[in-house]
């Protein structure tokens, strides 16, 4: 059986004991799930959680001799991932993906490697198994020597259109439970893909992703996933929703409360945009009653001039109004700022 190793790429060059905030690599988990469905032996090495150095990873690949490796890349660890790929001494097909790829793939095409390098722009859980099995019908949009660029957009047959039916086998994430700052055992989920907003600083901005549709999971699929989590980890106390669109309007707030009404043993935390609450301010109390413990808001700046420059919708007054309502209703608030 062919061996595929997926790497959650490191954020430091060397082994470190720094206690950075940790989130499970859910995207790699989805890819691993569908590689297994295709009959491919797959494992995930979480270089962040295991605190592996860049040299450790390259040596590990050369020692293990996998047939395929896949690794995600971010703007801040570009040079680290480049070093890993260029340090592979064995023959193996490589896959590289992540939100940043669409902006840097021309640079990746210049990397010095003799191995086949599949550069995936977009979501990879369907196209990667097809490439491994030699069954991919999609023609690469760019090619240089042994490097191939595949774009998975809404026109691709490998685009996950209905994400309510995309399954995640959480076994591949290992011990994904984290202790949040309330001392609760917590697991993270994603309930949407794509974004309806167009912030100038974000790689997921709508204007940069016109070829990708925003997709929302059904209430039933989210309930089913939480049931599966509790079946596997009955001592879980909190769910963290990582995407921005779980609380996107009044109707979705009602849906959130209905979902967690099924799980009275759980609290939950999630992201929310100021615009989602400013028009539904009366529903903030409902969120507290639905055991929402903490909300995360991208404030970015209190300067109206700067907010306009970065296309951050909602005014500073909106931020103040929403923040005050959240706190007065007993929900904790975490604000993100850009410096």
Predicted segment positions?
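Residue-level recognition of beta-strand->loop/alpha-helix junctions
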Residues: 8, 45-48, 72, 206, ...
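Glycine- and acidic-residue-enriched helix-capping/strand-helix junction motifs
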Residues: 14-28
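Extreme N-terminal starter segment of soluble prokaryotic enzymes
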Residues: 1-5
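Conserved beta-strand positions
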Residues: 6, 71, 96, 241-243, ...
């Amino acid at each position: 059986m062919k061996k595929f190793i997926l790497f959650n790429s490191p954020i430091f060059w060397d082994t470190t004991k720094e206690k950075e905030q940790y989130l499970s690599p859910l995207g790699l988990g989805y890819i691993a799930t569908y590689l297994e469905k295709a009959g491919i032996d797959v494992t995930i090495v979480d270089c962040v959680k295991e605190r592996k150095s860049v040299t450790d990873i390259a040596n590990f690949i050369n020692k293990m001799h996998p047939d395929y490796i896949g690794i995600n890349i971010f703007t801040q660890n570009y040079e680290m991932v480049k070093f890993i790929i260029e340090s592979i001494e064995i023959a193996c097909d490589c896959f590289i993906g992540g939100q940043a790829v669409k902006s840097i793939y021309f640079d990746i095409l210049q990397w010095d490697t003799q191995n086949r390098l599949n550069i995936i722009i977009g979501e990879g859980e369907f196209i990667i198994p097809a490439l491994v099995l030699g069954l991919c019908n999609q023609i690469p949009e760019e090619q240089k020597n042994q490097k191939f660029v595949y774009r998975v957009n809404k026109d691709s047959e490998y685009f996950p259109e209905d994400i309510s039916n995309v399954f995640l086998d959480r076994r591949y994430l290992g011990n994904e439970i984290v202790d949040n700052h309330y001392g609760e055992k917590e697991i993270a989920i994603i309930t949407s893909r794509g974004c309806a907003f167009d912030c100038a600083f974000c790689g997921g901005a709508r204007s940069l992703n016109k070829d990708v549709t925003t997709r929302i999971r059904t209430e039933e699929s989210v309930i089913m996933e939480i049931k599966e989590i509790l079946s596997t980890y009955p001592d879980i106390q909190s769910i963290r929703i990582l995407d921005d669109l779980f609380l996107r309007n009044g109707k979705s707030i009602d849906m959130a409360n209905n979902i967690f009404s099924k799980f009275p043993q759980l609290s939950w935390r999630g992201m929310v945009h100021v615009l989602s609450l400013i028009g539904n301010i009366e529903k903030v109390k409902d969120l507290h009653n639905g055991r929402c413990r903490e909300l995360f808001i991208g404030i970015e700046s209190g300067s109206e001039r700067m907010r306009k420059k970065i296309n951050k919708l909602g005014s500073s007054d909106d931020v103040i109004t929403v923040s005050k309502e959240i706190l007065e209703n007993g929900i904790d608030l975490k604000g993100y700022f850009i410096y």
